[in-house]
Amino acid sequence: MMNIVLARIDDRFIHGQILTRWIKVHAADRIIVVSDDIAQDEMRKTLILSVAPSNVKASAVSVSKMAKAFHSPRYEGVTAMLLFENPSDIVSLIEAGVPIKTVNVGGMRFENHRRQITKSVSVTEQDIKAFETLSDKGVKLELRQLPSDASEDFVQILRNVTK
């Protein structure tokens, strides 16, 4: 089985903080963007993967392909950082048999149909339900931009703003 060292929601995907901070702290040798939408959109996929450094393998795959790869002997010993666009994809991945115990909530951009709940996180009703599902499944949800930042309990933040 693959070794998942970080599961992070960050809709910027591969960017400076990922490349200079997170990847070093977790010593990942592979970055995997897990998104059904991006896996099917060749243009977005190419743009996202083009910024990965040459010393780190990067790929963008669907949720089902990630579940298969996780259990494949081919990826035994791979140390991977998983990047997600939203919490619903993580729920789907867990339900497909991939054990994720902690999710780092990094950034979800503001748009008109989203509610801003922190400086860096804006959510839809679907996102809120998915975060609640993750919490109900025992997944720890932490808000943290950088590895050096203090970890904040994202479930508590979500509860405080959605009362």
From Swiss-Prot:
Induction: By fructose and LevR. Changing H15A: Unable to be phosphorylated. Coiled coil: none annotated. The active site is at H15. InterPro entries: PTS_IIB_sorbose-sp, PTS_IIB_sorbose-sp_sf, PTS_IIB_sorbose-sp_subgr. The keyword Nuclease does not apply. Residues 1-163 form the PTS EIIB type-4 domain. GO terms for molecular function: kinase activity; protein-N(PI)-phosphohistidine-sugar phosphotransferase activity. Its EC number is 2.7.1.202. It is found in: Cytoplasm. One of its GO terms (biological process) is phosphoenolpyruvate-dependent sugar phosphotransferase system. GO terms for cellular component: cytoplasm. The phosphoenolpyruvate-dependent sugar phosphotransferase system (sugar PTS), a major carbohydrate active -transport system, catalyzes the phosphorylation of incoming sugar substrates concomitantly with their translocation across the cell membrane. The enzyme II LevDE PTS system is involved in fructose transport. The PTS EIIB type-4 domain is phosphorylated by phospho-EIIA on a histidyl residue. Then, it transfers the phosphoryl group to the sugar substrate concomitantly with the sugar uptake processed by the PTS EIIC type-4 domain. This is PTS system fructose-specific EIIB component. The gene is levE.
